[in-house]
């Protein structure tokens, strides 16, 4: 917030619900499914993990195409701010890395190994903070939109770092063969039986969150307010007030 200012954080928070929706869709709750099935230890764990990766990547490619085609419509017609266009395009770069990272985390959660997740998460956050502190001040001098876009793209770099760390923690004796990557019908059936209900449940909240800034901007524009004023006020609520309000949820979630 101190690096990009009120206007920057307001623009970022205007885009964030769209970011969250596509992130939820990109994972399709497959990490949760893999975690549960790995913990049961009844299946070929290698096939569960590595056969799911091509599926989730194909699904992400479809989402990337949707983002590329709809970014202009979302930014101009829904969010009413053309500056959102480039940051929304940047979301497409993050999806495969986020999905891969969470898939590997799901494997370790299923094995009840928390250390890989903890270490990868700490390093991921360090990378994100260092890159943000180093590059955002330079980018904001060029254009605020570039700085906000980088805040989206930095997730791609940090998630890639996390993937490398998680792969280091994978058992060294594992040899991935063609059969491990080839989807098995029973495994896919079991994975989808868990992921589809979970995704449907999460989508209800994500769609509501996605519609929040759209309805707010449309309503306030109809009431005669300027888009700059709306963006700043939404940024104050979503970027300052709500994080403080939801802070206690961190402790209950940890339990």
Task: Set out the residue ranges of the language-model regions.
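Transmembrane helical elements of multi-pass membrane transporters/channels
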Residues: 154-166, 170, 185-255
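Hydrophobic alpha-helical transmembrane segments
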Residues: 119-134, 142-172, 201
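Membrane-interface junctions at transmembrane-helix termini in multi-pass inner-membrane proteins
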Residues: 97-120
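Transmembrane-helix boundary and interhelical linker motifs in polytopic inner-membrane proteins
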Residues: 4-5, 22-56, 109-115, 252-255
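Short membrane-interface helical motifs at transmembrane helix boundaries
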Residues: 62-82
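Interfacial transmembrane-helix starts/ends
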Residues: 13, 44-58, 188-192, 238
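Small-residue-rich midsections of specific transmembrane alpha-helices
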Residues: 13-38, 93-100, 207-211, 238-255
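Alpha-helical transmembrane segments of multi-pass membrane proteins
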Residues: 81-103, 152-153, 237
């Amino acid at each position: 917030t101190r690096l990009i200012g009120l206007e920057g954080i307001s623009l970022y928070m205007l885009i964030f619900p769209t970011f969250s929706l596509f992130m939820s869709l990109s994972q399709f709750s497959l990490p949760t499914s893999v975690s549960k099935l790995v913990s049961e230890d009844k299946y070929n764990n290698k096939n569960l993990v590595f056969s799911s990766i091509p599926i989730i990547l194909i699904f992400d490619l479809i989402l990337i195409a949707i983002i590329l085609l709809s970014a202009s419509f979302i930014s101009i017609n829904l969010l009413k701010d053309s500056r959102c266009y480039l940051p929304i395009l940047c979301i497409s770069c993050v999806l495969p890395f986020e999905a891969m990272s969470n898939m590997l985390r799901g494997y370790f959660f299923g094995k009840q190994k928390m250390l890989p997740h903890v270490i990868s998460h700490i390093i991921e956050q360090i990378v994100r903070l260092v890159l943000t502190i180093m590059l955002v001040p330079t980018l904001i001098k060029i254009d605020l939109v570039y700085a906000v876009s980088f805040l989206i793209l930095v997730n791609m770099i940090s998630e890639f770092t996390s993937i490398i760390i998680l792969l280091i923690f994978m058992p060294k004796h594992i040899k991935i063969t063609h059969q491990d990557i080839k989807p098995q019908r029973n495994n896919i059936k079991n994975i989808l039986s868990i992921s589809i209900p979970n995704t449907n449940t999460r989508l209800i909240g994500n769609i509501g969150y996605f519609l929040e800034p759209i309805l707010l901007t449309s309503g306030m524009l109809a009431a005669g307010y300027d888009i700059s004023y709306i963006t700043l006020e939404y940024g104050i609520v979503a970027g300052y007030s709500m994080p403080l309000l939801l802070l206690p949820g961190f402790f209950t979630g940890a339990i």
